[in-house]
Amino acid sequence: MSVAEESGLSVSSNVAQCLVDERIPVIDISGYLSGDPQAVEQFAVDLRAIQEDLGFYCIVNHGVDQSLIDSAFDQIAELFALPEDVKMNHKVDFHHQGFIPNKAMILRWSKITKNEKKDLNEAWAFMRERTADDPKVVANIRHRGLNQWPEALPEFRKTLLNYQETMADLATRMLPAYALALDLPADYFDDKFSTPEYYNRCAWYPPVDVEEGQFSLSPHSDHSSMTYLPLMDVPGLQVMSPTGKWIEVEPLRGAIVVNTGEFFNRWTNGRFIATPHRVVPPTKDRYALTFFYNCNDETVADPFPSCIAPGETPKSEPMSFHDFFVTYMDGNYIYRTAEMDQD
């Protein structure tokens, strides 16, 4: 029996109307986070409706201090304002950690279009923080190396680590809602996210002229289990609706956009969608603190019991998160190839 059937709750009117109108729902999760039983059940019902339809929503009253988000935005603005030679001293490495120059990315994993133009943004990739004696660092496991921190910005590392830890805590607290939405026990994900991996992609999208078929960030679906994106006051993010319409995400201060990615889509056997989205050139500088939240590297995406019928063949082969992540990254980034130097 589903959580909706057990609770007798239906999708809230606000969410239902947003899905009909193809608008991004905004959900107050304060009741859910406080543990109010009815709020927990209602959020699970709404979450399932969203994830089977539009795949994107915004949360407010999420407990993340706005001053922390503002400080993180200030720090990444300073990061990308550094001289080019300073940034290039931290150029992205074998582990996809560090500075990613403009035009170093073509999102080829898109299911809706053939992206052929290089994206017009700069980024800096930070993975989960590790020390030199971490077993994965010692073993030189892909994408599990040491982060490259900008020495020129003394407050940057402290601010960003605080941001990452805070976002990871929020994402972990959200897991029971996803479990309940999938008719699983609330603690189902505890052992699968016991050592979660995360990828914090800080990005700068400047106002630029583009060629036909070129974007600040091409149409794509994320790799992640879940993605969390605090909004700033500059629009640019667009989400594809079920009917193929591009919906602009309103830059609502204090809100965090949430969506699921390709790995979770595999895990749910296609039930929870990985919605295509893109970034169009903004009218002024736009920055992003995208936080991709993922399960343990060793966790394998076998369909959940509620997402596959007895005897049904899974839509995808079982795959560990780490194997999936390496494949996704290598398929989208051209920073290690000669193609990067060809405009």
Feature map (PLM): residue ranges:
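Peripheral, non-catalytic segments flanking oxidoreductase cores
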Residues: 1-343
